[in-house]
């Protein structure tokens, strides 16, 4: 009788622990990420996808690229920075130019071409910077009907007498 009572008591405790575990997500292991105060709860395989940093619908998008670590390349090559013209030279600019800059720096001509915004597929895509031969051009019916004829048959084996067969 005492054995069955202790078995019932142990299964009852296991059930209580499971209920507490399922009701409280922080009952599982707590993993402290770093010194910035993020706390990651890792109590099942899917819980990590509901936490900050694992999905794009959190407040991550409200930060600028300068704030987010690792996006310096995207910030550097963004169209807003490329289009921004350099300031006009000052009348006192020659006083602040060093001899090294005067002798060794190459003056790059300022481009008068400004980029016009084109439709893009994803946020990092910048079709304005693609070379012309990579850009897609729409084919009209005239271009498809009156293009160069493509060969319809190919010869698999062509005999060339200049090639010696040994």
UniProtKB/Swiss-Prot annotation:
Keywords, A to Z, come to:
Cell projection, Cilium, Cytoplasm, Cytoskeleton, Flagellum, Nucleus
Q: Partners and quaternary state?
A: Microtubule inner protein component of sperm flagellar doublet microtubules.
Any one GO BP annotation for this protein: flagellated sperm motility
Query: What is the organism of origin for this protein?
Result: Mus musculus
Q: What is its main location?
A: cytoplasm
What segment(s) does the record annotate as region Mn 1?
98-109
The cross-references to InterPro entries, in alphabetical order and at most eight, read: CFAP68, CFAP68/107
Protein known as: Cilia- and flagella-associated protein 68
- Keyword Nucleus listed: yes
Q: Where are the transmembrane segments?
A: none
Family assignment from sequence similarity: Belongs to the CFAP68 family.
Q: Which GO terms describe its cellular component?
A: axonemal A tubule inner sheath; axoneme; nucleoplasm; sperm flagellum
- Gene this protein is translated from: Cfap68
Kindly list the places in or outside the cell where this protein is found, as annotated in its UniProt entry.
Cytoplasm, Cytoskeleton, Cilium axoneme; Cytoplasm, Cytoskeleton, Flagellum axoneme; Nucleus; Cell projection, Cilium
Annotated region (Mn 2) at: 139-149
Query: What does the UniProt record say this protein does?
Result: Microtubule inner protein (MIP) part of the dynein-decorated doublet microtubules (DMTs) in cilia axoneme, which is required for motile cilia beating.
């Amino acid at each position: 009788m005492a054995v069955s009572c202790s078995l019932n008591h142990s299964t009852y405790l296991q059930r209580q622990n499971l209920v507490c575990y399922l009701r409280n997500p922080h009952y599982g292991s707590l993993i402290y990420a770093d010194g910035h105060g993020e706390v990651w709860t890792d109590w099942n395989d899917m819980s990590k996808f509901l936490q900050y940093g694992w999905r794009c619908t959190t407040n991550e998008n409200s930060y600028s690229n300068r704030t987010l670590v690792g996006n310096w390349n995207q910030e550097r090559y963004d169209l807003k920075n490329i289009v921004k013209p350099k300031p006009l030279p000052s009348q006192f600019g020659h006083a602040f130019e060093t001899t090294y800059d005067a002798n060794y720096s190459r003056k790059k001509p300022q481009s008068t071409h400004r980029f016009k915004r084109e439709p893009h597929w994803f946020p990092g895509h910048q079709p304005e910077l693609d070379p012309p031969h990579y850009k897609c051009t729409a084919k009209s019916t005239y271009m498809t009907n009156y293009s160069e004829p493509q060969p319809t048959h190919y010869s698999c084996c062509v005999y060339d007498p200049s090639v010696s067969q040994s």
